[in-house]
Amino acid sequence: MKAAGAPLAADFFSGAGGLSLGLEQAGFKVILSADHEPFAIRTHAHHFGGMSVDWDLSDANVVERVAELVVAAGIDLVAGGPPCQPFSKAGRSMLRYRVQAGLRDPHDERRDLWRSFLEIIERSRPRAVLMENVPDMALDREMFILRSMVEELEQIGYSVEERVVDAWRYGVPQFRQRLILVALRDNVQFRFPAETEEKVSVWTAIGDLPEVEGGWRPEGGEYGWAEYAGPVTKFQREMRAKVPAPDQHKVFDHITRPVREDDRQAFESMTHATKYTDLSKEHQRYRGDIFDDKYNRLNENDLSRTITAHIAKDGYWYIHPRQSRTLTVREAARLQTFPDNFRFDGPPSAAFRQIGNAVPPRLGFVMGKAILESLDDPRDAGISTKKTAELLAEWWLKKDREEALPWLRSCSRWLVIAGEELLDRASRTLLRQGWKLLQRNDKPWALKSAQRTRFADELAFLTENSGREQRTDRILELADRLKKNPAALDGSVGEIRAALGVAESVADLAVLAAPREPREDREAGPEEPVLITKGVLRVASRFQGNLDVERRNRMTDGRLAVARMIGIGELSRSAHLGLIELANLWCRPVTPVCSECPLTPHCNEGHRQRNMNPTLYD
């Protein structure tokens, strides 16, 4: 790409241009951006060439126009961070149907902004896509938006990689987690950039900036400055690198809000470890049980807390580590890795809001550079999420095979719950006998007195001397609860838990294995929660060759890894159940039986086992 000149990029929902700046530092030329906030648009237009437009991307006609521009301009990378609004489960059901059927969006007058972002990509087919967003976009129970995006991008020929990253591992001096999704056309593999364990501390980032009083303003208004002595650390030198020579001893935007006298006294009594409730009573103007973190002095030797748009309101979360005031605009910009020559349009509150809403330029830089490196040295991405799900579902749907968790096929929420409570990790003999007993008594809450007594006796005999005697009592307790409320089994995960007192993982599994059609009093379709229990992380870790899936961030990396194997197409539920069964039948903690696994030809661990024992796979 580089040989023909700078590759072109578009940045949608661009804000002030943090992502745009990082992409340009990486080698892209940003020629098109769109946002809907006037101050941010003017900031972007000041710093970048091309078009910085105020267009409403929820309008289908605008989306079509933007896609045409992307094609006409020959844009290589479409980037952005679309806001994601919550939407109803009925909306999810309709969208799930359209995704599974491979249908395009109807020409709705308005739409969710993430759908607009995806529609631009589907219409323009750029070589690369980069999306940055909050982790919550991906980590709801069903991971619905992320799974939908991956499915649709794969349908049009992209390979997709996604990860929740810690921005500090790429040189950003704050604790800031972000979802990064990269899609490359023609099944080219994206390789995430290497991380660092070295943290850039708050003082390393801002320690060179001069002391100022809260509320101080320089002469000259927006053209005024504070006297600046010079950078000390490598990070500070990088922030000053493009400051024009006449301004080498000036720092702009080094202003903050005035400080109330009682706040100043409170700030002076604080260290970075002080909680709001630790302050003396005369300094607590808010209820401590509600505002327990109302004030936060930054630790100069550690990362800053996440810089958010909230800093535009009062700044109490961002008290300077040494001075009794909140951060200045320039200090907040530094912690977001905006260089000192980057100015913001509007009053301080608008500048703070632009900074808090921005993608850290340094994060944009490392991701942009990694995209260019992946495109310049193209490698095949291997098996897609859709194909992986197809293999798992095909194996799951086979009738003539051994079963580790037979209740998953029962289509009965009661049998799933009872199987988990009574027979989880049971011996083969106990599993066979216990499963037959549960099948014979598939509605124990409806048994008459004599029948219930016989069922209880059979359970007691089954579990005698097995260490599972208490599980007999648990099954009978669950049956008694259902006698009072048998309809609970048709409810949501929350309703099942409330009625039966089972673990969330058990209720999730019951809902996944035995979906229900929506009831008249509820708009929801069948739920598909993404489960990381029952050994599925082990399978995902081995399959993808990523040990972090099991060892670090199970609720983020782990859930993303599982979602990457099951997709959200018409086979996703079967694929998910197949993944759970596979973990318990063949992909064991010790001595996995890779020769029986349907994923072996595409599995990192499978390749290792094949090389060690080639005769088993002939």
Language model feature labels by segment:
Residues 130-134, 345, 509-510:
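Short beta-strands and strand-loop turn motifs
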Residues 68-72, 89-281:
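Class I S-adenosyl-L-methionine
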Residues 15, 44, 78-81, 117, ...:
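Conserved small-residue
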Residues 381-416, 471-477, 499-509, 517-618:
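C-terminal accessory module of base-excision DNA glycosylases/AP lyases that mediates lesion recognition
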Residues 380-492, 598, 602, 616:
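N-terminal polyanion-binding entry modules of DNA glycosylases/AP lyases
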Residues 2-125, 135-139, 143-146:
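Core alpha/beta nucleotide-donor-binding catalytic domains of modification enzymes
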Residues 234-382:
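C-terminal target-recognition/interaction regions appended to catalytic cores
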